[in-house]
């Protein structure tokens, strides 16, 4: 029999076919239309198995093609570069935590369960919320789950979402609610301030079918929403649930969502000790205020404290009848092990920072991002499209097409911001962007603009 270079067990095919009562591979796959079958060997890699040395050589050749940047990337859009203390990496790399095992058996999982409980407690304190679950996939999935949760609770079908919320999160929501009959209605934002347009909010909320109202703080443009408490009041008046999406890191500067009585809070823990890795893995945050009608409809897992038969305190998964332990169609979600390891990373990071460290870090980011915006707008004909206060991310409008600027930055081994329109880009500046890096970005852009305008 022909020996396939990748599959060592081809000589067992006849034996396996005989065992299942099938005469040939063609018969086994006869439900697949012939016109879409490939009846040839695929041209995979080098066409043969490689030795360990050859594999290592091949990988090293590819690694050499990577471009080493002169400065940390200036692109964010909700996923931003930060310094991660080595102790975070060390602790989550321990075998007790570095596992995909779900702690169904509390008698052998006390360490993992306690670590997740500590995450929940720290995040609850940071958000000023009562109940936090043990993690979600990311901000987008947490928001989608919040929308579905609101629909389960009140049965209404319309959710108001700001135009200035993260567009990637909105795409996730639209995907998740497909087939559910839930409608997303977008609320405009003020083109001068970048904040939510309250007049349009009043207009769009003037119906009885509002299930929830969502607002992001800071919004996608990095701008603080100064009227967020008014949005919460509108939701209460319409008997809808309020959903607040918040960057947890920004809470070193602004009021937490629990202080203005948000019903549901979502976010992402990426900026609390998680690296950049082609956009993942991320760590969704999900919290609610103390109301059992909310708690029992929460997605994901919740770790709680109980006592064993001897009266000794212990940790265990609680309210499990909400989750995948019951019939799938009755479960609030089926999110399984999700991002437990990254929740522990968040807990370690927050423990290391403490309250004062969090305040110092957010202030440092605030001042560095404002310094960068100031230096960029000192370039002739460069401006900020929005006049409101911002944190970490900010939009810049250029007199020439941003694609030209972006290409020049790449030539200089700099990663610019996210393109918002032909002439506008969203930049991100954090504690890892020192003055030298920011000044290099500014001088490169200034050189590019001056060169175009004088040519």
From Swiss-Prot:
SUPFAM superfamilies according to UniProt: PLP-dependent transferases
PANTHER family tied to this protein: GLYCINE CLEAVAGE SYSTEM P-PROTEIN (PTHR42806), GLYCINE DEHYDROGENASE (DECARBOXYLATING) (PTHR42806:SF1)
CDD domains: GDC-P
GO molecular function: glycine dehydrogenase (decarboxylating) activity
Reaction catalysed by this enzyme: N(6)-[(R)-lipoyl]-L-lysyl-[glycine-cleavage complex H protein] + glycine + H(+) = N(6)-[(R)-S(8)-aminomethyldihydrolipoyl]-L-lysyl-[glycine-cleavage complex H protein] + CO2
Pfam name, any one: GDC-P
Function summary: The glycine cleavage system catalyzes the degradation of glycine. The P protein binds the alpha-amino group of glycine through its pyridoxal phosphate cofactor; CO(2) is released and the remaining methylamine moiety is then transferred to the lipoamide cofactor of the H protein.
Superkingdom field: Archaea
Gene3D superfamilies in UniProt: Aspartate Aminotransferase, domain 1, Type I PLP-dependent aspartate aminotransferase-like (Major domain)
This protein's UniProt keywords: Oxidoreductase
Protein's GO biological process: glycine decarboxylation via glycine cleavage system; nucleoside metabolic process
Similarity comment: family membership: Belongs to the GcvP family. N-terminal subunit subfamily.
Protein name per the record: Probable glycine dehydrogenase (decarboxylating) subunit 1
Annotated EC: 1.4.4.2
Enzyme class, broadest EC rank: oxidoreductase
Naturally occurring in which organism (per UniProt): Saccharolobus islandicus (strain Y.G.57.14 / Yellowstone #1) (Sulfolobus islandicus)
Family annotation (HAMAP family): GcvPA (MF_00712)
Subunit architecture: The glycine cleavage system is composed of four proteins: P, T, L and H. In this organism, the P 'protein' is a heterodimer of two subunits.
UniProt entry tagged with the keyword Oxidoreductase: yes
